[in-house]
């Protein structure tokens, strides 16, 4: 069983024919919906299709809503795009104007107040660079330092400048309400800067009936990196969003930051996603570059919970091939990892709480007995996530009583979710879990399993029991 999970972004390419179904059957664990683009009507169609297909194939594919967040974008050009030449003058304005080769509006209405002369402005992931030379009223006058073509609604980054944009815009709130109504499983919080950003979003979700949605903080700028420890504590997972990060932060720092974040998030027992440009050339080509294949493999060696495809599946020419390639790279890389050694090394960083002690003992027992699988019986998913933290070599079977918990566990490293239905007698649950694993071909007679759970069942965060069981007829 592949341990590293795969997130696929849905878009026009996945709307065609049976592409979405093929993504599911090829290894997609989570469907990402990017709310920086597209309409509610189109996103609802995609969510409905995911729901229908996961029911058809009995696959717990989760839905992740990715917010627009406190980002800055260009507005629109009269001719949709313009080409800027190095050395020319160009103006960004917070006034509402029609874009030309000389001026264009931006979405942040107070940008002229936040920015200063000498600031660098990067457009379209840094492909075009401007230097601020003067600020007059609402107009920001710039000199083009790196020319190129820019088009409608391209992203704008301003490294080193703390912007006064609220973390949650009115659009973000509307998007979250839509996500609650559609029963999404995760929200990816774009441009997370502080733990307070996450707390604000959690409060909004709770106030509107979405407290069971898990929040993934996207780290995309230096402020988020500086506050990474408190952000990890506040959220349920981290996305290393290397696109904007690589614009806001020097490129040579990104691999170092990626490895640092992955290590910290694993130690916290939470999910970590490595994202952006992983197989970017497969937007146009049926095979990735060798550098891209190595990039995916290196993230897996680092222990990432999931790798993510963005434009490759949303708008690329080879979406299904991209998922299959990512799955192949993951499966091959995982065969080379010495999980026992990693487990022994990680013991040095163990939190001495009851749950950690039981989960550590569960994994240690599984190694000692050469167990086929670890079975966690869980109401909230907590037990399974804590086992996943230790990255055991055997399968982790996450037996949950709730469909949403099953889908959320489908993002956790190494966890194979199984729905058991409600039952409050612990040994009945264990027997039901064994039978479900036998039914799905995960276990057979004679296999050794290590079972862990919290007793009494239903009290979240109380993993306190370990049981060894040999599968019988």
Predicted regions and their residues:
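Non-catalytic helical/linker scaffolds that mediate oligomerization, partner binding
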Residues: 1-473
């Amino acid at each position: 069983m592949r341990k590293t999970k795969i997130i696929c972004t849905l878009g026009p390419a996945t709307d065609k024919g049976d592409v979405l179904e093929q993504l599911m059957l090829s290894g997609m664990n989570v469907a990402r919906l990017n709310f920086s683009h597209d309409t509610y009507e189109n996103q609802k169609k995609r969510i409905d299709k995911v729901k229908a297909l996961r029911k058809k194939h009995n696959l717990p594919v989760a839905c992740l809503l990715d917010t627009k967040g406190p980002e800055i974008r260009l507005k629109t050009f009269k001719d949709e795009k313009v080409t800027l030449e190095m050395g020319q003058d160009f103006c960004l304005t917070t006034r509402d104007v029609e874009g030309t080769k000389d001026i264009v509006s931006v979405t942040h209405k107070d940008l002229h107040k936040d920015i200063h002369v000498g600031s660098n402005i990067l457009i379209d992931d840094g492909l075009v660079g401007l230097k601020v030379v003067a600020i007059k009223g609402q107009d920001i006058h710039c000199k083009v330092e790196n020319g190129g073509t820019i088009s409608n609604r391209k992203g704008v980054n301003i490294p080193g400048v703390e912007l006064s944009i609220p973390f949650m815009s009115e659009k973000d709130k509307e998007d979250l309400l839509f996500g609650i109504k559609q029963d999404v499983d995760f929200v990816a919080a774009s441009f997370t800067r502080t733990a307070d950003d996450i707390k604000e979003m959690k409060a909004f979700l709770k106030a509107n009936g979405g407290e069971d949605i898990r929040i993934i903080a996207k780290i995309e700028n230096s402020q988020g990196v500086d506050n990474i420890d408190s952000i990890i504590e506040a959220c349920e997972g981290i996305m290393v969003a290397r696109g904007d990060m690589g614009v806001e932060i020097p490129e040579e720092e990104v691999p170092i930051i990626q490895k640092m974040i992955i290590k910290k998030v694993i130690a916290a027992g939470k999910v970590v996603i490595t994202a952006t440009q992983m197989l970017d050339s497969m937007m146009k080509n049926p095979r990735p570059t060798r550098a891209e294949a190595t990039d995916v493999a290196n993230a897996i060696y680092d222990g990432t919970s999931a790798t993510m495809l963005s434009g490759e599946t949303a708008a690329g020419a080879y979406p299904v091939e991209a998922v299959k390639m990512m799955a192949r790279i993951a499966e091959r890389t995982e065969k080379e990892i010495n999980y026992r050694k990693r487990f022994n090394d990680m013991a040095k960083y163990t939190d001495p709480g009851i749950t950690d002690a039981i989960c550590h003992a569960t994994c240690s027992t599984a190694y000692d007995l050469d167990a086929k699988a670890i079975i966690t019986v869980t109401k909230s998913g907590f037990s399974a996530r804590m086992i996943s933290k230790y990255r055991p070599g055997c399968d982790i079977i996450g037996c949950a009583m709730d469909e949403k918990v099953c889908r959320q566990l489908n993002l956790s490293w190494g966890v194979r979710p199984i729905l058991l239905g409600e039952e409050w007698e612990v040994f009945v649950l264990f027997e039901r879990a064994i039978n479900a694993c036998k039914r799905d071909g995960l276990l057979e007679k004679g296999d050794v399993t290590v079972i862990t759970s919290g007793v009494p069942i239903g009290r979240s965060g109380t993993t306190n029991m370990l049981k060894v069981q040999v599968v019988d007829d």
